[in-house]
Amino acid sequence: MTSKFTLSTARPKGPLALIATPGARELTELVDKNLVEWYKSVDVDGSLKKDTFIIDSACPRFTNGEGKGMVMETLRGKDLFVICDVANHGVTYNFFGKEIPMTPDEHFADLKRIICAANCKPERITVVMPMLYEGRQHRRAGRESLDCAQMLHELYDMG
């Protein structure tokens, strides 16, 4: 029988790291603030002292709409949590001189770019999505695609 999960029994695979995709910055900062406070409360000898767990990253876009993912710090051996809010339509980008809101598909593409930029170096990657991408479709009708299932397969195959 497995033991009950609690914060004291949960062990990270390595040092914690957080990455916010575009549109998830505020949520990631709230999570980071709570983690820093919690680490300070359980840190007896000062070895866990950390000001932030957020890793500097970016998903810039070119004027034709193409994008790329960039991670500015090493993730080797870290327990990485990537936070992605695919339902945030408040994020815009410049597309041939016009500001265009990001769609859930573009948020998901940025998530995959960040995972690729991590280059399989973290010890573990966990994706946190407040709203599951394409999660509104609960059954197949006719010849429809099952995008949520496809997305989960893609993320699983990425490692």
Tell where the protein language model's regions lie, with residue ranges.
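PRPP-associated nucleotide enzymes
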Residues: 1-159
